[in-house]
Amino acid sequence: MRLAVNIDHIATLRNARQETQPDPVTAARLAELSGASGIVCHLREDRRHIKDRDLELLRATVQTKLDLEMAMTKEMKAIAIKTKPDLVTLVPEKRQELTTEGGLDVITRKDDLIPYIDELQQHGIPTSLFIEPTPEAITVATEVGAAFVELHTGKYSLLKSPKEIEAELLRLQDAASLAKKFGLRVVAGHGLNYENTAEIKRIKEIEEVSIGHALIARATLMGMSEAVKEMIRLLQ
């Protein structure tokens, strides 16, 4: 299982003082040199962490895979087409939320997703949908032309009861198996950390996990390189 590192909170720390450091581009390079298979950044509409200039520099420097998380808006689509990330992940976005709170409602937005994804594909940009691990969402992801699904692990990460954890892992397993059956590539993310990620390894259909906050928090104490290497060891 591979590791993609979300570097949003390097930018959060930088922006807390409106300074130039720490630099998310440097952090991304260190993550790659330490074995990360990809870099994830979320260009939010309010630009609360990653800025447009960060995205431009990341596109110019990332050597593995650049995954741009973004809301499904005209502005973001234009930015994606101009920047040409290796992957676009469509996520829900609310200005008042601290972090993404759930999967994209692909069922009610199905008719909007089809032309949106098609235009990105016409420019050579594959699309991933950040979704809840349900058969209905996976079916729609197939129908609208997504190449990937990112299964939302937020509920799993919050559970405490072993019985509930096992039930959620089974739900993730069933979703991943169905997605794979439909020809989708499967990744997972949200709320994963150094304590709960090992269990996700059991789901063989998940080829990569996207981890941000927990890894960046660890990096503030022990450095980016060691934080990345430690997570990779857990995934192997």
UniProtKB/Swiss-Prot annotation:
Binding residues for 1-deoxy-D-xylulose 5-phosphate: D8, H9, R44, H49, T99
Highest rank taxon of the organism: Bacteria
Molecular function via GO: pyridoxine 5'-phosphate synthase activity
E.C. code: 2.6.99.2
One GO BP: pyridoxine biosynthetic process
Binding locations of 3-amino-2-oxopropyl phosphate: N6, R17, G191, G212, H213
Reported function: Catalyzes the complicated ring closure reaction between the two acyclic compounds 1-deoxy-D-xylulose-5-phosphate (DXP) and 3-amino-2-oxopropyl phosphate (1-amino-acetone-3-phosphate or AAP) to form pyridoxine 5'-phosphate (PNP) and inorganic phosphate.
PANTHER family in the cross-refs: PYRIDOXINE 5'-PHOSPHATE SYNTHASE
Protein name: Pyridoxine 5'-phosphate synthase
Species of the source: Chloroherpeton thalassium (strain ATCC 35110 / GB-78)
Organism lineage string: Bacteria, Pseudomonadati, Chlorobiota, Chlorobiia, Chlorobiales
